[in-house]
Amino acid sequence: MPLSYQHFRRLLLLDDEAGPLEEELPRLADEGLNRHVAEELNLGNLNVSIPWTHKVGNFTGLYSSTVPVFNPHWKTPSFPNIHLHQDIIKKCEQFVGPLTVNEKRRLQLIMPARFYPKVTKYLPLDKGIKPYYPEHLVNHYFQTRHYLHTLWKAGVLYKRETTHSASFCGSPYSWEQELQHGAESFHQQSSGILSRPPVGSSLQSKHCKSRLGLQSQQGLLARRQQGRSWSIRAGIHPTARRPFGVEPSGSGHTTNLASKSASCLHQSPVRKATYPSVSTFEKHSSSGHAVELHNLPPNSARSQSERPVSPCWWLQFRNSKPCSDYCLSHIVNLLEDWGPCAEHGEHHIRIPRTPARVTGGVFLVDKNPHNTEESRLVVDFSQFSRGNHRVSWPKFAVPNLQSLTNLLSSNLSWLSLDVSAAFYHLPLHPAAMPHLLVGSSGLSRYVARLSSDSRIFNHQHGTMQNLHDSCSRNLYVSLLLLYQTFGRKLHLYSHPIILGFRKIPMGVGLSPFLLAQFTSAICSVVRRAFPHCLAFSYMDDVVLGAKTVHHLESLFTAVTNFLLSLGIHLNPNKTKRWGYSLHFMGYVIGCYGSLPQDHIIQKIKECFRKLPVNRPIDWKVCQRIVGLLGFAAPFTQCGYPALMPLYACIQSKQAFTFSPTYKAFLCKQYLNLYPVARQRPGLCQVFADATPTGWGLVMGHQRMRGTFQAPLPIHTAELLAACFARSRSGANILGTDNSVVLSRKYTSFPWLLGCAANWILRGTSFVYVPSALNPADDPSRGRLGLSRPLLRLPFRPTTGRTSLYADSPSVPSHLPDRVHFASPLHVAWRPP
């Protein structure tokens, strides 16, 4: 007869009518019994002949591909003009007095952040935008380009102008080195950064030269020039001689020196009024003149006799005959003025040599499962986390559940702040730009690469007969719809572009580390400025707690103003006031302790409702089930040990079959959740110790000992002794000299013992006692005669590595005394 659920509960000593613990508990360590129970519950039978189940509820397993859903109406989120103040350390010191070593070190780490990969692999521009939605290629291309353009406008990205220069929008930092022209630097501002000169300025020609990549004194192009005379004359009509250079085709050939600027040379005269400062060549093009380059080398892209070809793929359609009803020339002729071929930022800086390549692909997805209206850019820089040259990212402290509860479980009022686009606050050094490149090869190549199997030869699409190869009904219809959304930006977005990150990107393992350092330093400063409140953060989630609601509101105003003064952008719509139960990191934390949030409890109920019995479930599904149940395991009677059979099946990559008893056991475990309570400081007065053959306890002045029927492994014996001490004395602080018991991880013990011990020792705090000083050492060896003096061992609750108490150094006298708002507390209250 199979083991029933009631019998199994009794076996695990979860019922009250169990016999004396000293007899019952050691039986659970018996290997034979564990094996027998595993067979009864069908836990060990991993080799099954029935086909595996690959889907349970929302959990999918092996061989299932979830098709990503493209939303043609995605809104691109707007990014505030985020600029974190460069003198953030000075501002914090004005606010709170001298910073501690830890705070200073952490803030220096991100001002600016640096990124040093060992090896960087460059990919062709075609791989810039991933064909993630094969059905919606063109739509996805333009949405992604628009997202990248938005980020560039918000100062998050640099735009590669030439191999050694980049432009960006927003306020410059001092480490962004101005663009030099030869030895003299031009248009120097007080900040030492080059801003764009006005169009009519005398620096125009110099600026054009530097755009053409001619920094001759730096020897960049000295070898290529070989004494050619380059001059810029404004007296020659563009039809007289075609300027040299075609649009870079994305194939990476940057030998045509003028290629980057050629896109600006042909612009309709209409644009004079509309774009006074967009193009560097405005002065010439608007008056119908162009840059002339003398003495073209004989091997130039085309001979002089050839008729001039406009370098812009998009605008070429204007002069060509429509090839069909769905020819792109119909769309290009919709507008007289399509705007500039390229936009340039407000500032130009020097950058290390950056090739015309990308180092990671991008694509769009839903912002989050609850918000499918807006899109989110996914950047794949996984090359830095893979292979022999992978970068090992720095580790940082993630607060565990007990530490969080010790810190935050109190009778405070709470609110949480939302930092908008938290990653994009932290500036990156320009030296990192060549490693973090995204971009695209332009619409013509993107469409050609995906629509035809033929190889695209370099510059092939520059000729007229190949121009119409890309015309198709699908492309025509897509562009017509997109024209309603983007208007004349279609032209701008159809050009190739290469962008490097100016702020830390999300797809690199360094970023979460830096963000965690940054927010923890800021919270540390806030805690010291307001000693009677609690500020805590994990990544971009910042919470504030205070004794009363009025106090919390004034604190909220003060902290918000402080954060805004540092240049940190908060999202006021997402500020949440929680009352006395804080919702943080998936938990609800109140004065009683912590519990999982409601939506997680609902997911668990749903999971058990859909869980099939007596059917082999694919280990990938088990992995997902364990992920969900593991989060709530600390709140159950038996904790993680109850999930051990599932862990074993995942490790051996076999299917797992839930027997009705095991499912009922887990179901009952997860339907009654117990809060994880805050640990309290106290004195340890109960000690336990064991040898393989016996155990001993000391409770105050009372001492006990006992023996095991058969010798046990030492860790098992120590665990049993701790369980006896807890059940005999009822004390919730125990002294032990065994590090495994101290760690409270009971997953390596025999399965039944681990489950039972977890319930007996739930809520117990352990203090380490060296063996030589442990008063229970003698009783465990069978000697009751000698009594050692009782130790007074204090227990301090741990807050893990999330150190809170940075003691405030004395504030220098020249700072005025801060006026405290009427505090409901007479004494400065310290967090628990």
Swiss-Prot record:
Region of interest: Disordered: 241-263
GO process annotations (BP): DNA replication; symbiont-mediated suppression of host innate immune response
Binding site for Mg(2+): 418, 540-541
MF term (GO), any: RNA-directed DNA polymerase activity
Its EC number(s): 2.7.7.7, 2.7.7.49, 3.1.26.4
PANTHER family the UniProt entry points to: PEPTIDASE A2 DOMAIN-CONTAINING PROTEIN-RELATED, POL PROTEIN
Function: Multifunctional enzyme that converts the viral RNA genome into dsDNA in viral cytoplasmic capsids. This enzyme displays a DNA polymerase activity that can copy either DNA or RNA templates, and a ribonuclease H (RNase H) activity that cleaves the RNA strand of RNA-DNA heteroduplexes in a partially processive 3'- to 5'-endonucleasic mode. Neo-synthesized pregenomic RNA (pgRNA) are encapsidated together with the P protein, and reverse-transcribed inside the nucleocapsid.
Homology family: Belongs to the hepadnaviridae P protein family.
Protein name: Protein P
Gene name for this UniProt entry: P
